[in-house]
Amino acid sequence: MTLLTASSRAAARLLGAKNSSCIIFAARHASTSTNLKDVLANMIPKEQARIKSFRQQYGSTVIGQITVDMLYGGMRGMKGLIYETSVLDPDEGIRFRGYSIPECQKLLPKAPGGAEPLPEGLFWLLVTGEIPSQEQVNWVSREWAKRAALPSHVVTMLDNFPTNLHPMSQLSAAVTALNSESTFARAYSEGISRTKYWEFIYEDSMDLIAKLPCIAAKIYRNLYREGSSIGAIDPALDWSHNFTNMLGYTDPQFIELMRLYLTIHSDHEGGNVSAHTSHLVGSALSDPYLAFAAAMNGLAGPLHGLANQEVLVWLTNLQKELGEDVSDQKLRDFIWNTLNSGRVVPGYGHAVLRKTDPRYTCQREFALKHLPKDPLFKLVAQLYKIVPNVLLEQGKAKNPWPNVDAHSGVLLQYYGMKEMNYYTVLFGVSRALGVLSQLIWSRALGFPLERPKSMSTDGLMVLVGAKSG
């Protein structure tokens, strides 16, 4: 009988140990300190030594092949990054430091009386690989509350943006302006040792995560609530609860939804646009504010962070055309018309996943519990029964199953947040938990400047022996 730590657990999953009866996966609660930085300081030398030994033994080992199609196809499937905080399994979905979403829902601490995991706990897990105690999560909540205040120039900036400036543009600009507060940029200019980089990246990351709800809430209030005040941070409340209050929502169910939303959107391994962007920009030793702002510019792209909006637009058009109570056959016909016109069914399929996205599943379970009779949810549930079969009949989709975007917008709409242009800002606030966790480790492990080799088409043709004419 073997008990696995978080890192060993993730490796065992990859090696197929999930079917072995001789292995028991144990939730790892190794550290007792409530100070996250102290816990990290103890972990980092051990991880540095582990990786150094691994590279000495296996540094020249070949791990895969690169094809011409990979270069032209967005580097899909190419193993080219180290990203510690999460791994995306095609069949099981995302694993945060080895833990699936259902496991995180079960093991991570909750708010008093709550049923959903607190994002503070997920952040602790991403940074340390350990399931935190309630006391450790409470420490993170208090720490973020202490660091949340915005500098006056950022407040002035947000209050003077034109109302036609997209919420994501406002988020990116405000985060960039926070660079004035960077402890890392200041320390780097003073010549700190490379071994100390991670300490200042940690401080900036904690500050940024703490301030993001204030920035995001201010954007929301300015655009959609006539500039009304976001109020003050309550140090007795958790991060999501404070964020929801500042947005102007007090429904306990919506607060629970926000805890779930901010947890499940936090990380999706390192190859997606926002995660890779933060890793790339951070490798130039840009501070976390600049790296995260760059990531948000990537998230703002329609192929990355706008998919949940596209789902809602498609659902709204469907309802307008067919009404609320639609037969399965009419839905099938509508889906086929969508496909035959050269469009896709938004919210279905994924670049890596080959099963239903577990982030979809947990949102579906939330809806079944809290809003089972909502017409839009009932439509989404009906589509879940029909769309995959139609896509399989069509024969083009590698993955006919729903992803996270097929559901999140419906839940937000139900609780009154109907401003679709804003949804990607929520996504961005959540994604900070993952990409900044990795940024801390990238500097702790001394990852170098990212600089892959590019090729021209002519050069590639010469390399493979093709005729260039």
From Swiss-Prot:
Pfam families: Citrate_synt. It comes from the Eukaryota. Its EC number is 2.3.3.1. It is an enzyme of class 2 (transferase). The keyword Hydrolase does not apply. Homodimer. Belongs to the citrate synthase family. This is Citrate synthase, mitochondrial.
